[in-house]
Amino acid sequence: MEEFKRYLELDRSQQHDFLYPLIFQEYIYALAHDHSLTTSSSLELEKAGYENNSSLLIVKRLIIHLITQMDHFGFFTNYSSQNPFLGHNTTLYSQILLEGFVVVVEIPFSIRIISSLDLEGKEIVKSHNFRSIHSIFPFLEDKFSHLNYVLDLLIPHSIHLEILVQTFRYWVKDASSLHLLRTFLHKYHNWTNLITPKKSRFSFSKQNKRFLFFFSNFHVYEYESILAFLRNQSSHLHSKSYRPFLDRIYFYEKRDHFVKVFTKYFQAILWSFKDPFMHYVRYQGKALLASKGTFLLMNKWNYYLVNFWQCYFYMWSQPGRIHINKLSNHYLELLGYLSSVGLNSSMVRNQMLENSFLIANVSKKFDMIVPIIPLIRSLSKAKFCNLLGHPISKPVWADLSDSDIIDRFGSIYRNISHYYSGSSKKMSLYRIKYIIKLSCARTLARKHKSTVRAFLKRVGSELLEEFFFEDEFIFSLTFPKASSSSGGLYRTRIWYLDIFCIHDLANYE
């Protein structure tokens, strides 16, 4: 935010209507380059050749070509033989231009956020902890335990390219920028799989993750903002997170059209939004809509969402993508956890004068458990065990040193242990530890051409325990009371604030 505010001191008339000239500025590509260095790993940069190929000289050549050539979009055509100036670097120039373009199109959104916060006298708080995936689970524990039904839906993503361009036109009215956006979208035509983690978009995400994340979030934000707008029209519980964006002309045009077509039924439709206990959570291209209402109310939400996507975004949503489940008797597959709302019963003895009696107290509890079967299936897919959960060796790691092999296996277990540290029933992690630990021993024995028993007898079993119990030792120092009792370590629930991505083994769908 501060980078945009420092570098992009634009005139008010240029903030939205004349973004295209910024593509000719060198500092735009410097910002894109710095962002790639800070957000990408060295391995990704090495594979992409970014460190070796990106330089100020290449950027200057790119800008000169954009200024002198009439065809600014020639990077996307196969004419390298006709243009000796570009030669074999057409792909590189196209990639650099794409990265600079993403920085440019982010400007209206960033300026709108900064200006709205300045008007309200608020500061931009860097709440990095709220980015953690684990931050969502305490919210679910606090809210979902009082709810009855949940709408589990898969967000439709197959939107037409021109629909996206037309929607984006309300943010950026610069025709040249829109033409460049259309060119990028048609070049990377498999962008329609942005939302769901499919293999078809893997190659695209490797080329420019920032473009991927920006337009996937923009696509989802469009319909979420309209839902928030309608929600705020019928409830006093206004959502502050959408306030900076709700004054757009686009939303009011949609609202006016909505009222014009459904004037007679507008109040009846808004009745569906009047549930004060409605909660919305989005994750991995999916969403949860939970309510304390009845099955009839959730069915109305189902009907509305399907028609909403089809009428306003021309996206077909199959009825099988939306499921209405009762929280008390159905498990939710949420971010690698199995979650449900169960009944927690307890007996309280009450004494009144000479009479004593027992009172049965029943309360709801939102419970998360480790999905052991999908985890074993993921370990089997990664060649740590077979489908029955029997550990096997990892031959591809046999050429590494002993310390590297142990460190890799230990790191995998620590990641899994951290991710599922918030589960109330973590005893199944014993089996995961057994699989990874014995797979490590089999790999080391394979490397030294020995049996597992002979290898452990020669080096001692403490060699593996040191790595696999390191996390538990640190936990016992931090929470001595929890670890002092038998099994206390596996009964205590801990949510971490540094988990920003789902572990590969947890992403088993």
Curated annotation (Swiss-Prot):
Name the keywords, alphabetized: Chloroplast, mRNA processing, Plastid, RNA-binding, tRNA processing
Presence of keyword RNA-binding: yes
User: Where is this protein localized, as stated in its record?
Assistant: Plastid, Chloroplast
S-S pairs: none
Name it: Maturase K
Give the originating organism: Hottonia palustris (Water-violet)
The protein's matches in InterPro entries, at most eight in alphabetical order, are given as: Domain_X (IPR024937), Maturase_MatK (IPR002866), Maturase_MatK_N (IPR024942)
Supply the HAMAP family for this chain: MatK
Q: Which family does it belong to?
A: Belongs to the intron maturase 2 family. MatK subfamily.
What gene makes this protein?
matK
Per the record, GO CC terms? chloroplast
- PANTHER family membership: MATURASE K (PTHR34811:SF1)
Pfam families membership: Intron_maturas2, MatK_N
- Coiled-coil ranges per the record? none
Please explain the role this protein plays, according to its UniProt record.
Usually encoded in the trnK tRNA gene intron. Probably assists in splicing its own and other chloroplast group II introns.
Q: Which GO terms describe its molecular function?
A: RNA binding
Name its GO BP terms in alphabetical order.
mRNA processing; RNA splicing; tRNA processing
